[in-house]
Every structure is written in C-alpha cells, then in structure tokens.
C-alpha cells in the first residue's frame, strides 16, 4: 500500500509510475484520491472545531449551573453540535473507506533501475553463469537467449525433456495423480523423493550458515494476511480458500513469514530479521491453461525453501542483492547454468518495487526457465500489515521494508537437474554438493536397475 503523503506531495511521481507499469486506467484514481482526501481533511478540521465549541459550551453550562441560571439554550446548542459531529464522523468514515479502496489497489512504486516494458518478453538479462550443454539444434536460439555472453558445449544428441526422464527413471506417476487429484498433480517416487528432500536440506543448511532462522510456518493463513502480502487478483488466480473458514492455503512461505510480525513494533536493534521458511506451496495456476501441462514444472503443489527479510529502509536494496546472490550460489553449487533477469514494469506485479528472476537453462527444452524470484517490496506489505520498528522507546515508529526470494523450489530444481545432468544413456549424474544428502551419486534408468538386479541373481 502506498503512503497517502506521497500522493499528496508528489502525485505526478505516482502517475508517472502507473504509466511505466501500463496501469493507465488507474491514473485517474490519483486525482480522485486527492479530492477525497481534501474532503476528508476538511471534515476532520470541522469536527475538531465543533468539539472545541462543544467543550466551550460545557464550561458555560457548568458556570450557569453554579449560578443557578437556566441552561436549556446551551444544552440545545450542545446537542445540535453533537448531531453535526456524528454526521461528519460518518462522512469521514465513508471517505476513508473510499480512499482505502484505491490505496489498497495501487501497485508499489518501482525502483529507477527497473526496465520499462510491456511483458516478460522485455525483461532484461543482466548476467550469466555456467557452461550450458546445448544440442546443435538449439544452438542459434541459445546464442540469441544468452546474448552471446555465456559459455557452452555443443552436443550432437538431444537431451530428453524432464517429462521423459521422469518416465524412464520411474521418478513420478502423473497419470495416477490425475486420477486421484486432477491435472497438475504428481506422485514423486523412488530416488526423486530423496532428491527433493536433499534439495531442501542443502538450501536450508546454506542459509542457516548465513544467519537465517529456520521456520516451518503455518500452511494456512487468514484473509487479512493474504490481503496484506499480495494483490487482490491473486485471490482468483492463485490462492486456494478453505471452504467455510477464514483460511487460505499458502502459495509460498513468504506469506506466513510476512504475517508473522503483523501489527507489531519491532526493536530497531533486532533488524534485519532473517528467516528461511520451508513449506509446501499450493497454487491454482488459473490463467495458465495450456502452459506446461506435462511434467512437474508448473504444478498445484510443490516444496519450496524461501528467504524472507525484514530490514531498515536504508538497507533494503543491499539485502535485495544479497538474496539473489544467495540463490545464485545455490544454483552454482548445483552446477545449473542460468541467467539473472531484471524484471520489467509490465511483468513486475503489484507488490515488488524491483524483482530479479533466475532462469535456468533447460537443455531438453532449449530455453531458459524461471526457477527463482527475488523481490524488494519496500514498505508496500509492511503498511498493509502494520509492521513497524523504532530505535528508541518514545520514537515515532517507521515502517520496515520486506524482501523475499526463492532459495529453491524443489520441483523446478529437479526439472533443471534432470535436463542438465543427464547422460545420453539417461543416467542422471547428481551434483557433488548433494551426495552427502542423497547417499547416492547418480540415478539410473529403470531398465538399467533391472539389469543390475538380474546380474546379481
């Protein structure tokens, strides 16, 4: 939520930012907010003046009572003032509700470094890491996507899609999951279960070493929390509601971690607060019909390790860079080639002032796909959830800044591992950093396991 003072003092800045975001229809809201705010403040002044007059009348009534003089005329005036105050207070309440309606639906102010663009096609790659395995048939599109700035190795065999790898490894059963739960669900099986858990523990250990407090949050939150952390459109497109309850299944651990300190005043000395949340995530994926319908890349349920920071405003941009760096280190140790993308205004969403994505090279698909998002939400969430801090007891509290970033979403990380670390024979060579968590170094196709077993008989 934006600060009403910002709109009062710099309406052109807010309008200009809406233009950058392509939210043209909301520009007129700013003038409407200013007009409503003017009436609201005028009414408050009138109420204060009337209260002053009522207090003066009370003094006069007291004096007349002592003197034994009639007070009927003064009581009539006082009662009339009370009625006027009640009318104005009702108007103030209605005006405030109208102002809040707009404020709660305005996006965050973007950082000056955010590129202007209409959609994800205009996001800007800013750096690349790793040596990509590129099938010769994908070479030209790879060079285009990597801007010629990424090292690569050309291979003459086409890596399998993760969907096909899941089948030959017997790593998932999507057909039976569809029977039980519908589309975009899956049973994870065999070594991939261990791999999923290994990825969680690897990311968790790394962040604990960096001073993050591990948290398993509630998997359901109340509506006021969801309203505080995300845009209203997400209630239709993303979030599952528990029928008959004021509870919603979390689409990310970011949401309960943001709500953790709702309506609190934090001690300045305790900032930054660093949390790493581990949770399942539940998403409707409405509006994505036809996209990634096969496999486990875009699903209704998955595990995720999430970084979350409450920081001082002056430190939040530094923390934004640290969060994306943490995520990059994770994917570097997993030996997954990737690019970091600065998300443009048209793809940014309402909550973030700036967002980076990490997009992993998917050797089977021949393109980069999102595996991490890291956002600085500045005070947009903190205002909605009333999360403030102060350094001294009698100091006026200030709003914190909130930041979040994926550390690892296991289903997408598994997709990246299956597509990048497979051999021509279909063996998956796991990155060394996971060996101590998995207890094995590679995953064999099912037919190879059968041969192994037959040889032992």
Swiss-Prot record:
Compartment(s): Cytoplasm
Gene3D superfamilies (alphabetical): Bira Bifunctional Protein, Domain 2, Serine-tRNA synthetase, tRNA binding domain
Binding site for ATP: 283-285, 299, 370-373
InterPro entries: aa-tRNA-synt_IIb (IPR002314), aa-tRNA-synth_II (IPR006195), aa-tRNA-synth_II/BPL/LPL (IPR045864), Ser-tRNA-ligase_type_1 (IPR002317), Ser-tRNA-synth_1_N (IPR015866), SerRS_1_N_sf (IPR042103), SerRS_core (IPR033729), tRNA-bd_arm (IPR010978)
Main location: cytoplasm
GO cellular component: cytoplasm
Pathway assigned in UniProt: Aminoacyl-tRNA biosynthesis; selenocysteinyl-tRNA(Sec) biosynthesis; L-seryl-tRNA(Sec) from L-serine and tRNA(Sec): step 1/1
GO BP: selenocysteine biosynthetic process; seryl-tRNA aminoacylation
Subunit structure of this chain's protein: Homodimer. The tRNA molecule binds across the dimer.
Chain's role: Catalyzes the attachment of serine to tRNA(Ser). Is also able to aminoacylate tRNA(Sec) with serine, to form the misacylated tRNA L-seryl-tRNA(Sec), which will be further converted into selenocysteinyl-tRNA(Sec).
Family: Belongs to the class-II aminoacyl-tRNA synthetase family. Type-1 seryl-tRNA synthetase subfamily.
Protein name listed in UniProt: Serine--tRNA ligase
Organism: Thermococcus onnurineus (strain NA1)
Gene: serS
């Amino acid at each position: 939520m934006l600060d009403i003072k910002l709109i009062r003092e710099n309406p052109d800045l807010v309008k200009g930012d809406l233009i950058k975001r392509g939210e043209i229809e909301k520009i007129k809201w700013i003038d409407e907010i200013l007009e409503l705010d003017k009436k609201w403040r005028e009414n408050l002044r009138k109420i204060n003046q009337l209260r002053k007059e009522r207090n003066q009348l009370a003094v006069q009534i007291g004096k007349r009572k002592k003197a034994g003089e009639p007070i009927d005329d003064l009581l009539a005036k006082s009662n009339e003032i009370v009625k006027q105050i009640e009318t104005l207070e009702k108007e103030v309440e209605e005006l405030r509700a109208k102002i809040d309606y707009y404020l709660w639906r305005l996006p965050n102010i973007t950082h000056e470094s955010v590129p202007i663009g209409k959609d994800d096609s205009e996001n800007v790659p800013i750096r690349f890491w790793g040596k990509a395995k590129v099938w010769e048939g994908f070479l030209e599109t790879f060079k285009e996507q990597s801007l010629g700035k990424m090292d690569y190795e050309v291979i003459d065999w086409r890596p399998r899609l993760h969907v096909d790898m899941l089948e030959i490894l017997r790593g998932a059963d999507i057909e039976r999951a569809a029977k039980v739960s519908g589309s975009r669900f899956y049973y994870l099986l065999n070594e991939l279960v261990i791999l999923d858990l290994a990825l969680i523990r690897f990311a968790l250990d790394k962040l604990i070493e960096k001073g993050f407090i591990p948290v398993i949050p509630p998997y359901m939150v109340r509506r006021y929390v969801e309203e505080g952390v995300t845009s209203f459109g997400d209630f239709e497109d993303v979030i599952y509601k528990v029928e008959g309850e004021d509870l919603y299944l979390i689409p990310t651990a970011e949401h309960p971690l943001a709500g953790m300190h709702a309506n609190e005043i934090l001690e300045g000395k305790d900032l930054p607060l660093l949390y790493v949340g581990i949770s399942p995530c539940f998403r409707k994926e409405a509006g994505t019909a036809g996209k990634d319908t096969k496999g486990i890349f875009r699903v209704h349920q998955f595990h995720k390790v999430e970084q979350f920071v409450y920081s001082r405003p002056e430190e939040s941009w530094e923390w934004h860079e640290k969060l994306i760096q943490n995520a990059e280190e994770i994917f570097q140790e997993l030996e997954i080639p990737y690019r970091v993308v600065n998300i443009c205004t048209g793809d940014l969403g309402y909550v973030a002032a700036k967002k980076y994505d990490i997009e992993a090279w998917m050797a089977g698909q021949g393109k980069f796909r999102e595996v991490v998002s890291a956002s600085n939400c500045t005070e947009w969430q903190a205002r909605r959830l009333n999360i403030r801090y102060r350094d001294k007891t009698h100091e006026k509290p200030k709003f914190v800044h909130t930041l979040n970033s994926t550390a690892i979403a296991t289903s997408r990380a598994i997709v990246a591992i299956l597509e990048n670390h497979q051999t021509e024979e279909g063996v998956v060579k796991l990155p060394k950093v996971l060996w101590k968590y998995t207890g094995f170094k590679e995953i064999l196709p099912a037919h190879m396991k059968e041969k192994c077993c037959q040889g032992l008989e």
